């Protein structure tokens, strides 16, 4: 029996929408990374972008467990000497772009490389409850009801 490999024409992408209000960031990011990679599908092929498109709304209302909201530190470097910058999730959520908390969590749960960058483009995060993808008729996923630990 030959191994089945998915062809580009056989890829069937769905659209999902998840309301992030009250959800735990890490659990949500792990679930979304699985959807973006397509690992939930029986026809998953590692070298193809067979994952689905995911829309996350209410990104500014996510929760962190424990004291991570104040104690967790995100690092980035400018490239210049002494250019190490630090910030916390609390600063990001109260800042100009609160959706970046979820974007960073999901991006860091995907592998590195060109395929992961292409998969990450299928993620759409909005801080409010409105999104501009109504024409795609996304399926709503109630992530909080999948496990009691998903919601805080």
Curated annotation (Swiss-Prot):
InterPro entries associated with the record: Ribosomal_uL13, Ribosomal_uL13_bac-type, Ribosomal_uL13_sf
Disulfide-bond pairs as recorded: none
SUPFAM superfamilies: Ribosomal protein L13 (SSF52161)
CDD domains linked to this entry: Ribosomal_L13
A biological-process GO annotation: translation
Keyword Ribonucleoprotein: yes
GO molecular function: mRNA binding; structural constituent of ribosome
Keywords: Ribonucleoprotein, Ribosomal protein
GO cellular component: cytosolic large ribosomal subunit
Family affiliation: Belongs to the universal ribosomal protein uL13 family.
Function recorded in the entry: This protein is one of the early assembly proteins of the 50S ribosomal subunit, although it is not seen to bind rRNA by itself. It is important during the early stages of 50S assembly.
Oligomeric and partner information: Part of the 50S ribosomal subunit.
NCBIfam families hit by this protein: rplM_bact
Descriptive protein name: Large ribosomal subunit protein uL13
Organism of provenance: Wolbachia pipientis wMel
């Amino acid at each position: 029996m030959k191994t089945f490999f998915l062809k580009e024409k056989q890829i069937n992408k769905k659209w999902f929408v998840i309301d992030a209000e009250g959800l735990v960031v890490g659990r949500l990011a792990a679930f979304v990374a699985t959807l973006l990679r397509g690992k939930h599908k029986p026809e998953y092929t590692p070298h193809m972008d067979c994952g689905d498109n995911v829309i996350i709304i209410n990104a500014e209302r996510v929760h962190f467990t424990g004291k991570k909201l104040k104690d967790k530190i995100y690092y980035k470097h400018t490239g210049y000497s002494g250019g190490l910058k630090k910030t916390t999730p609390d600063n990001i959520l109260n800042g100009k772009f609160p959706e970046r908390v979820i974007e960073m969590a999901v991006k860091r749960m995907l592998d590195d490389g060109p395929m992961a960058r292409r998969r990450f483009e299928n993620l759409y995060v909005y801080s409010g409850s409105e999104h501009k993808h109504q024409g795609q008729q996304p399926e709503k996923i109630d992530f909080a009801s999948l496990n009691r630990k998903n919601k805080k």
